């Protein structure tokens, strides 16, 4: 097979044998790919310091079912300011692990690739905020087909008037007050801000005040957790840094 050249973001790496490294890449043209970088741990000539999480690369690889072959890389950016700030490291590590865990191998999702790159660029410019994390999560769920259903009760199907009271149910569902009488309340402002997250493509444009942030967070956490077999490794560190 002939090698192809494609833009990619490094999601994860793992040492393999004495000198090799297995790299999980989110590529623009082939989706998530795991590639074997031969000699990456001993030789700096072919890969340099490029094979680190968050790095955005132009990669040359031979795509195969299972484990692809990574032939070479050119660095687009390693997002140096992310690596100098603990909050940015926490948010960036969470973002790439979340994409890795939710995206199946070989699924090409250009919109999600652009969302992740935009988030990493925003973090590199000092934008590590809880609001931007929730913006990223809401849009990621939407792109992958897990969009939050904010306008009708997940249990009985009744449509909500614009300012109707809502309750948060299990697994990120939204319920009417009759079906979700014991669920945490969701204010009209929280619902409005979540709708706005799905209507704008710009990080930093939406800021959740403390109360809506406290309501939106568990709802999004539940929606994401419903699609994960186990908790994210990066989440414990992120929770130490931010709400």
Curated annotation (Swiss-Prot):
The reply to whether DNA damage figures as a keyword in the UniProt entry is yes
Q: Which residues form a coiled coil?
A: none
Q: What GO cellular-component annotations does this UniProt entry give?
A: bacterial nucleoid
Per the record, the domain of life is: Bacteria
Q: What is this protein called?
A: DNA repair protein RecO
Q: Which InterPro entries match?
A: ARFGAP/RecO, DNA_rep/recomb_RecO_N, NA-bd_OB-fold, RecO, RecO_C
NCBIfam families per the record?
A: reco
């Amino acid at each position: 097979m002939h090698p192809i050249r494609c833009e990619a973001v490094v999601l994860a790496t793992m040492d393999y044998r004495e000198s090799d490294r297995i790299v999980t890449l989110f590529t623009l043209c082939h989706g998530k790919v795991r590639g074997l970088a031969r000699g990456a741990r001993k030789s700096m000539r072919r890969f340099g310091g490029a094979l680190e999480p968050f790095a955005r690369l132009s990669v040359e690889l031979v795509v195969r079912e299972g484990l692809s072959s990574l032939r070479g890389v050119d660095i687009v950016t390693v997002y140096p300011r992310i690596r100098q700030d603990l909050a940015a490291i926490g948010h960036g590590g969470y973002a790439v692990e979340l994409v890795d865990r939710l995206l199946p191998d070989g699924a090409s999702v250009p919109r999600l690739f652009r969302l992740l790159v935009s988030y990493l660029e925003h973090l590199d410019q000092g934008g590590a905020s809880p609001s931007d994390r929730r913006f990223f999560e809401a849009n990621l769920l939407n792109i992958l087909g897990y969009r939050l259903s904010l306008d009708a009760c997940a249990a009985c199907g009744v449509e909500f008037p614009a300012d109707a009271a809502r309750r948060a149910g299990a697994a990120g569902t939204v319920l009417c007050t009759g079906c979700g009488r014991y669920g945490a309340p969701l204010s009209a402002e929280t619902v409005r801000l979540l709708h706005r997250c799905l209507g704008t493509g710009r990080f930093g444009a939406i800021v959740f005040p403390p109360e809506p942030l406290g309501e939106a967070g568990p709802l999004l956490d539940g929606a994401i957790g419903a699609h994960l077999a186990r908790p994210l490794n990066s989440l414990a560190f992120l929770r130490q840094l931010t709400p």
